[in-house]
């Protein structure tokens, strides 16, 4: 069947054909784009960037199979409308490698259009499913990465920073939820762990939630009320990050039982002004630290789940930090 008679009951029989749509690819529906603009403005008032996904493969209308001329017509219109908003990022596609009728030449053509026609030079990237795009391309401002393994993604953040030399946005490290798909049923505790792991490796993780509820709607695609636990901990995390010196964190030396982040601009300094050590799923009762004999550090032990900060005073030289519980992060 085509999408003209698609319903909830027969969705699994959908063949991808679009003959029943009779879609007019020569005219735009202004009300549709006006609605998107209203959403962008609402996000702007909340201080949120709108990462505009311009194309995606989950298509029952035929938009992913348009001709080159139809594609270009669409892209020019979208760029002309949305580039005027200051809180817009460009995501060329969600899971670009599943759009089987598009090739690298197509994606590079779209990127060139954005670079030429967006006078405000908004941030640009492209999101993968299984295959990475070439993030070293000059038009790519940051890497937009989906998880690569069942158990690890955040753990590769520092490796990707070195490989691509650009900010690493982990916009799909799985979702907290309970759906019967591996990408959407991790616990809130695991989501929080992945966030801290990514940040202490110099990355920028993104949150999503896929709990099945009585309305049979997922927050991930419909919005509404969040049902999980991880989102409650991210405001606490943001508050800590806003207090760190400098404009961002970079990964520093890693030990067997923790990862460490320091201010990006201090990375080459012998002794930094700030260290953030994350113990992930490790739970030592105490840990000894030493940098030099002169520099004084204020020690704070952060409980990333219970959202508490325990101050352990100002010390220098060799110092022992008491942890006594799991989910601990040390701030010096």
Which stretches of residues belong to each language-model region?
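Catalytic-core region of carbohydrate-active enzymes that cleave or remodel glycosidic bonds
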Residues: 119-121, 137-216
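Short coil/turn segments at the loop-to-beta-strand junctions that recur within blades
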Residues: 317-318
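Short, flexible/disordered intra-domain loops and linkers
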Residues: 64, 100-105, 179-188, 218-222
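Active-site mouth of glycoside hydrolases
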Residues: 1-153, 163
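Hydrophobic anchor at the start of a short beta-strand
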Residues: 50, 168, 299
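Aromatic- and carboxylate-lined catalytic core of secreted/periplasmic carbohydrate-active enzymes
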Residues: 176-179, 191-313, 322-332
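Short, flexible, glycine/charge-rich loop motifs used to bind or transfer phosphoryl groups or to couple energy/partner
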Residues: 78-81, 130-136, 157-159, 188, ...
């Amino acid at each position: 069947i085509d999408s003209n008679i698609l319903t909830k009951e027969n969705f699994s029989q959908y063949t991808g054909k679009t003959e029943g749509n009779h879609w007019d690819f020569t005219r735009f529906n202004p009300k549709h784009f006006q609605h998107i603009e209203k959403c962008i403005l609402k996000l702007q008032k909340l201080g949120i960037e709108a990462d505009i996904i311009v194309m995606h493969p989950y298509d029952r209308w035929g938009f992913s199979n348009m001709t080159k001329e139809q594609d270009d017509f669409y892209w020019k219109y979208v760029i002309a409308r949305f580039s005027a908003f200051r809180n817009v990022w460009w995501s060329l596609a969600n899971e670009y490698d599943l759009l089987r009728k598009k090739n690298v030449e197509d994606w590079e053509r779209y990127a060139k259009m954005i670079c030429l026609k967006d006078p405000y030079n908004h941030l640009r990237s492209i999101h993968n499913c299984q295959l990475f795009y070439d993030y070293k391309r000059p038009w790519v401002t940051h890497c937009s990465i989906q998880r690569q393994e069942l158990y690890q993604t955040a753990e590769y953040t520092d490796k990707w920073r070195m490989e691509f030399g650009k900010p690493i946005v982990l916009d799909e490290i799985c979702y907290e939820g309970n759906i019967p798909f591996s990408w959407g049923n991790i616990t809130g505790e695991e989501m929080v762990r992945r966030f801290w792991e990514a940040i202490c490796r110099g990355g920028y993780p993104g949150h999503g939630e896929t709990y099945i509820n009585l309305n049979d709607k997922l927050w991930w695609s419909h919005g509404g009320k969040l049902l999980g636990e991880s989102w409650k901990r991210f405001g606490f995390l943001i508050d800590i990050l806003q207090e760190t010196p400098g404009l961002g964190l970079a990964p520093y030396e890693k030990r067997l039982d923790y990862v460490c982040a320091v201010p990006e601009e201090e990375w080459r300094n012998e002794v930094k002004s700030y260290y953030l050590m994350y113990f992930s799923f490790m739970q030592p009762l105490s840990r000894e630290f030493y940098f030099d004999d002169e520099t004084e550090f204020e020690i704070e032990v952060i409980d990333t789940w219970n959202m508490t900060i325990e101050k352990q005073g100002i010390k220098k030289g060799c110092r022992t930090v008491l942890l006594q519980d799991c989910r601990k992060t040390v701030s010096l």
